[in-house]
Amino acid sequence: MKNEIHPDYHPVVFQDAGTGFQFLTRSTATSDRTIAWEDGNEYPLIVVDVTSESHPFWTGAQRVMDTAGRVEKFERRFGGMARRKKKA
């Protein structure tokens, strides 16, 4: 293996923004925020939108994730095209 070409792989805490669920894993991701973990050490904290605690596949619950109104925006821009009939 070559030296100095691999990214820094270190322990990181990920936190679910919706549920507050946290887990410690290893990652190349970095953050200025830190958190004291159960073992007494400080680790970088990365807040994410979805984890296994809140993802519909794992929870069995459906949740709308359309934060930007993308479907409505698409309908406004292109919705009329499907309704128009082509003239022969």
From Swiss-Prot:
<dbReference type="InterPro" id="IPR002150">
    <property type="entry name" value="Ribosomal_bL31"/>
</dbReference>
<comment type="similarity">
    <text>Belongs to the bacterial ribosomal protein bL31 family. Type B subfamily.</text>
</comment>
<protein>
    <recommendedName>
        <fullName>Large ribosomal subunit protein bL31B</fullName>
    </recommendedName>
</protein>
<keyword id="KW-0687">Ribonucleoprotein</keyword>
<dbReference type="InterPro" id="IPR034704">
    <property type="entry name" value="Ribosomal_bL28/bL31-like_sf"/>
</dbReference>
<dbReference type="InterPro" id="IPR042105">
    <property type="entry name" value="Ribosomal_bL31_sf"/>
</dbReference>
<dbReference type="GO" id="GO:0005840">
    <property type="term" value="C:ribosome"/>
</dbReference>
<dbReference type="GO" id="GO:0006412">
    <property type="term" value="P:translation"/>
</dbReference>
<dbReference type="Pfam" id="PF01197">
    <property type="entry name" value="Ribosomal_L31"/>
</dbReference>
<dbReference type="GO" id="GO:0003735">
    <property type="term" value="F:structural constituent of ribosome"/>
</dbReference>
<comment type="subunit">
    <text>Part of the 50S ribosomal subunit.</text>
</comment>
<keyword id="KW-0689">Ribosomal protein</keyword>
<dbReference type="GO" id="GO:1990904">
    <property type="term" value="C:ribonucleoprotein complex"/>
</dbReference>
<dbReference type="InterPro" id="IPR027493">
    <property type="entry name" value="Ribosomal_bL31_B"/>
</dbReference>
